[in-house]
Design a protein with these regions (language model features):
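Hot-dog-fold acyl-thioester-processing enzymes
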Residues: 1-82
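A short acidic, glycine/proline-enriched capping/turn motif at secondary-structure boundaries
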Residues: 58, 65-66, 86, 92, ...
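Mid-chain, well-packed structural core segment of small domains
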Residues: 71-95, 99
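HotDog/MaoC-like acyl-thioester-processing domains
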Residues: 1-2, 90-145
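Generic structural detector for well-ordered beta-strands
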Residues: 17, 84-86, 139-141
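Short, surface-exposed, polar/charged, turn-prone segments marking secondary-structure boundaries
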Residues: 44-45, 53, 80, 87, ...
């Protein structure tokens, strides 16, 4: 059982240089045909300084391996339950973003195969000047046992 005392625990900040190759590969992997994520000329023609990341790209920047390990989740099965995104502006190739993750909530739910834990993580990404770029709220379901 996850302890509610985890609520409020924050990760160390991690800084990411957003690369155009990462944006392009992500767009291709999810089948996003948006030329702003695939074609630099199209992105520049639309007024951006580089490729524009698809909306769900921010998830790849948060919830670091080190933070997951610090929560001591063990080897339980983890199911991605829900996700929401808020953007102050698009993520663009060349951005240098600092991301922090925080445990927003820990809940217990009854499942068909027994009790399970629900873990809610909030990621926040900020630009080099400290400006908010995005927030991601993710819900994970963890089977016990």
């Amino acid at each position: 059982m996850l302890e509610r005392s985890l609520i409020g625990r924050e990760s160390e900040p991690t800084t990411h240089e957003v690369e155009k190759g990462a944006i392009r590969r992500f767009a291709e992997a999810i089948g996003d045909p948006n030329p702003l994520a695939l074609d630099e000329a199209a992105a520049r023609a639309a007024g951006f300084s580089g490729l524009v990341a698809p909306p769900t790209f921010a998830f790849t920047l948060g919830w670091s391996e080190r933070f997951r390990h610090s929560l001591d989740l063990g080897t339980r099965s983890v199911l991605h339950g829900e996700q929401s995104f808020e953007y102050a502006r698009p993520i663009v190739a060349g951005d240098r973003l600092t991301v922090r993750s925080k445990v927003a909530d820990v809940l217990e739910r009854a499942g068909a195969s027994g009790p399970m834990d629900v873990l809610v993580i909030e990621d926040e990404g900020r630009g080099e000047k400290g400006d908010l770029v995005f927030k991601v709220r993710s819900t994970f379901i963890l089977r016990r046992g």
